Amino acid sequence: MKKKGLLIILSGPSGAGKGTVLNEVRKTYKNLEVSVSVTTRAPRAGEVNDVNYHFKTIEEFKELAHDGAFLESECVYGNYYGTLKSEVFDKIQKGLDVVLEIDVKGAFNVIGKYPDAVSIFVCPTSMEELKGRLAGRGSETAEALELRLRSAMGEIKQATKYGYVVVNDDVKECADDVIAIIKAEKCSTKINKDFINTLTGGSI
């Protein structure tokens, strides 16, 4: 019997390195599909449409929202982001594990609709480290940097509401922690109820 895949939520403040950690996870954990989010923000250097994001106009985004295409959607820093249902549930039914790299508010929206989601929060080692990473991007004004840091503090305070917290002190070690969480969840009773029910002929 083919088991359903997991829905995995990966969150963390901007600059925590969650994207880098996720890329490292995908190098060794092959049963993982990354849900490509829809956004109205402009592409950053090196980003490719339909690979990093589905880039849409505000009008296109609102049309998708009106059609009920999103599992969740949020406005962050003046830009809209959304997770397409089609990017998630078709793959889960095929046995693939799907990861959503989304912010805290979006994560709680998904958990409210899909309580079995595995939620993982990526933390920096310190606020000083986080500030250094953000400043190192060279793309933030001093005012924008302070806004990001205040937002990050608020997000980190929500980390205790997640199922798991990992600290990104070393990318490889942090990725290994994420993989260990996924593997443990794959063996959990909540994921294997259908399998046990089939094995026993529906006697439970």
Regions found by a protein language model. Give the residues of each.
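Short hydrophobic/aromatic beta-strand immediately N-terminal to the Walker A/P-loop
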Residues: 7-9
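P-loop (Walker A) phosphate-binding loop of NTP-binding proteins
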Residues: 11-13
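Conserved lysine of the Walker
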Residues: 18
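Post-Walker A alpha-helix
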Residues: 21-22
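Post-Walker A helix-loop "phosphate-sensing" segment adjacent to the P-loop in P-loop NTPases
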Residues: 26-35
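ATP-dependent small-molecule kinase phosphotransfer cores
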Residues: 37-98, 105-108
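Conserved phosphate-donor/acceptor-positioning beta-strand/loop module used by diverse small-molecule
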Residues: 98-103, 112-136, 168-170
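NTP-dependent small-molecule kinase module
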Residues: 139-140, 154-204
